[in-house]
């Protein structure tokens, strides 16, 4: 009963903390023509290729070189099982004028450029180009180079 003497039902009694509804990993892909492919990619849990904390994937946004470096580094780490790669260059001075050594993608960029998988955007000016979009030709070349590097780690290659 409340202060006026009326009966009321407690909303707390119906609320069950043991029951939760899982939110979709990405809520902005519902009507996307590649939804099934995006959901498959999300299941792989590749760093740099996941939905943000607000469950947005932004399927039509261009991928930056910084994000792409994270993706390739994560694949390299997963296949080689060398977790030390993720911190190999931390604490080093950045060789690029447009990338700080404390940037979230710094180690990934250094790992991939040191292995020749990704090129710097402008070697003369010393720029990696982290915010530049990744172009199709760069993707094809870097994936071939990554595949060549990983051949010895994968059976049947």
Please place each PLM-identified region on the residue numbering.
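C-terminal functional regions that serve as terminal interaction/effector modules
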Residues: 108, 114, 118-119, 141, ...
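Hydrophobic core segments within long, regular secondary-structure runs in both alpha-
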Residues: 38-42, 73, 109-110
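Positions within ordered alpha-helical repeat solenoids
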Residues: 43, 74, 114, 145-148
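Feature responds to low-complexity, polar/acidic, surface-exposed segments characteristic
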Residues: 1-35, 49-69, 74-106, 119-136, ...
């Amino acid at each position: 009963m409340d202060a006026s003497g009326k009966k009321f039902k407690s909303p707390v009694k119906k609320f069950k903390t043991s029951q939760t509804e899982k939110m979709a990993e990405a809520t902005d892909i519902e009507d996307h023509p590649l939804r099934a492919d995006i959901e498959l990619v999300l299941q792989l849990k590749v760093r740099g290729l996941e939905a943000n904390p607000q469950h947005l994937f932004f399927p039509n946004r261009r991928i930056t070189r910084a994000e792409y470096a994270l993706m390739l580094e994560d694949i390299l780490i997963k296949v080689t099982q060398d977790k030390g790669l993720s911190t190999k260059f931390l604490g080093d001075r950045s060789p690029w004028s447009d990338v700080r050594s404390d940037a979230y993608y710094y180690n990934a960029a250094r790992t991939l450029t040191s292995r020749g998988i990704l090129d710097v955007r402008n070697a003369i000016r010393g720029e990696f180009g982290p915010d530049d979009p990744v172009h199709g030709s760069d993707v094809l070349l870097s994936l071939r180079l990554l595949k060549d590097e990983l051949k010895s780690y994968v059976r049947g290659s």
